Amino acid sequence: MNILMLTFIICGLLTRVTKGSFEPQKCWKNNVGHCRRRCLDTERYILLCRNKLSCCISIISHEYTRRPAFPVIHLEDITLDYSDVDSFTGSPVSMLNDLITFDTTKFGETMTPETNTPETTMPPSEATTPETTMPPSETATSETMPPPSQTALTHN
């Protein structure tokens, strides 16, 4: 526990030391100037700082540079649009209603809105017989092969 407290104290002191040594030193009125070895082209020398550094003040600025004021944000000016919040469910599915489907001429399942029960649409009936629709090879194999329910019983 003592080692942990000592570590926290050392870390706190290190942050204070690094802030003081790595920040550029300020000088002149209201800390406008910077202490440098040599002034930049847009600065002029005013006086001598510590450790043989020159206090340099910008020529372009006025008597001293002011910090810009923070922009004022009025909460009354901010308007949020909550119209989409109620309709968003969080799912990636589209907002189409699944209970109502479009009437199609293809085969498939449609829902009737009145009963909410699935209805299977069948193709229009044609006057065909099984002999005309099935190839001769399939009719021969279907006569010789027993139905699938009987084959399952015979293999057990």
Swiss-Prot record:
Composition bias type Low complexity, residue spans: 109-144
Nucleotidyltransferase listed as a keyword: no
Keywords for the protein's UniProt record, in alphabetical order: Antibiotic, Antimicrobial, Cleavage on pair of basic residues, Defensin, Disulfide bond, Secreted, Signal
Region of interest (Disordered), residue spans: 108-156
Entry GO CC: extracellular region
Residue ranges annotated as propeptide in the record: 68-156
Cysteines joined through disulfide linkages: 27-55, 35-49, 39-56
Principal subcellular localisation of the protein: secreted
Localization annotation: Secreted
Any Pfam family: Defensin_beta_2
GO biological process, one term: innate immune response
Signal peptide: 1-20
Role: Has antibacterial activity.
Family: Belongs to the beta-defensin family.
Protein name: Beta-defensin 125
Species of origin: Homo sapiens (Human)
Lineage: Eukaryota, Metazoa, Chordata, Craniata, Vertebrata
